[in-house]
């Protein structure tokens, strides 16, 4: 969802990033993805030499935006920093999250690596919670084919609840279909309905208690479910950004903030105080990403391919938890029925 270009204006003042439109009706599209998934290749293939680079204001993080046209419509693509998460534990994650929230994007594309899809889906799920007008681009299909990996694109789309387009951007394949899907989700009267991540019952109860209060206050500018989680986190810097962007400080809203404090107290009573409930949220994201990936990828054909795939999986299980423990600490919790429910 996020604040759109209509609600923020051409300058996207909330991020202080000047968006370089050539026409007032140019679409603003955020391009997100993990590092090394070919995101820059997609960006370069679509925009060619029509690019502008610099730094995000106040950050030592490189910014890039470029323009392309398809079917008479102009698009400004904003290449977000490569990140594994939107939980804002680094400058890159903060930039990506804040642009998706406040940067005026009409929609988003999340680029994934077809050869290690499961690892990429964590960011996809987080992006969908924030911006449902999203298209998932499964890139590097040519490399996946060489390694004997097949991604079931239609099944992946069903499990995520948003359009999924396959691409081999290095060969220019799939880009027309990608932009057609982008236009489709942006121009649709209603956004897609992504399949929500199921959090532990105490967290879902806390979120549900806040949504009726948030929806009339947000008025569609940000998703109430996603915002409820952020209020429960209580990140002061993000709340300052939220207050400036919406001209409304939730901390000064007695009824709402009282409900936030009560929801936190209830989580504490159930043994999920402090950062414990955040760890469970991260666990649910990781488990859901793994289950969707496992249900959407056909295993490799050759013994050599299987060895490489298993090595990638082992590395992922080492690196993935390290990334999240680095920010939150704690162990992951499993949901044994999740994979079965996602094999639809």
Regions found by a protein language model. Name each.
Residues 57-64, 76, 88, 92-95, ...:
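Helical mechanochemical/support elements of P-loop NTPase systems and associated helical scaffolds
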Residues 2-90, 102-103, 107:
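Conserved G1/Walker A P-loop phosphate-binding module
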Residues 142-198:
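Canonical P-loop GTPase G-domain recognition
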Residues 36, 43, 50-53, 128-135, ...:
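N-terminal alpha-helical transmembrane segments of multi-pass membrane transport
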């Amino acid at each position: 969802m996020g604040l759109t270009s209509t609600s923020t204006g051409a300058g996207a003042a909330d991020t202080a990033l000047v968006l370089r439109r050539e026409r007032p009706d140019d679409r603003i599209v955020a391009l997100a993805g993990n590092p090394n998934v070919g995101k820059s290749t997609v960006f370069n293939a679509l925009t060619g030499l029509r690019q502008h680079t610099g730094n995000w204001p106040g950050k030592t993080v490189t910014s890039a935006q470029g323009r392309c046209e398809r079917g008479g419509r102009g698009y400004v693509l904003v290449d977000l920093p490569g990140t594994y998460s939107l939980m804002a534990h680094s400058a890159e994650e903060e930039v990506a999250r804040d642009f998706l929230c406040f940067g005026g994007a009409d929609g988003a594309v999340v680029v994934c690596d077809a050869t290690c899809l499961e690892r990429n889906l964590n960011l996809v799920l987080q992006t969908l919670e924030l911006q449902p007008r999203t298209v998932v681009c499964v890139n590097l299909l040519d490399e996946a084919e060489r390694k004997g990996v097949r991604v079931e694109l239609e099944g992946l789309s069903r499990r995520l609840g948003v359009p999924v387009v396959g691409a081999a951007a290095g060969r220019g394949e799939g880009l027309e279909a990608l932009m057609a899907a982008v236009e489709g989700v942006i121009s649709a009267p209603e956004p897609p309905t992504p399949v929500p991540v199921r959090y532990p019952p105490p967290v879902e109860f806390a979120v549900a208690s806040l949504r009726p209060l948030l929806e009339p206050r947000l008025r569609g500018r940000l998703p109430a479910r996603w915002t409820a989680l952020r209020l429960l986190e209580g990140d002061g810097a993000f709340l300052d950004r939220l207050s400036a962007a919406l001209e409304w400080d939730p901390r000064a809203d007695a009824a709402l903030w009282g409900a936030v404090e009560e929801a936190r107290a209830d989580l504490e009573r159930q043994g999920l105080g402090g950062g414990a409930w955040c760890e469970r949220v991260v666990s649910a994201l990781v488990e859901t990403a793994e289950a969707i990936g496992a249900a959407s990828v056909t295993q490799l054909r050759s013994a050599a391919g299987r060895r490489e795939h298993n090595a990638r999986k082992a590395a992922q299980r080492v690196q993935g938890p390290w990334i999240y423990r680095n920010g939150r600490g704690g162990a992951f919790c499993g949901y044994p029925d999740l994979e079965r429910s996602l094999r639809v």
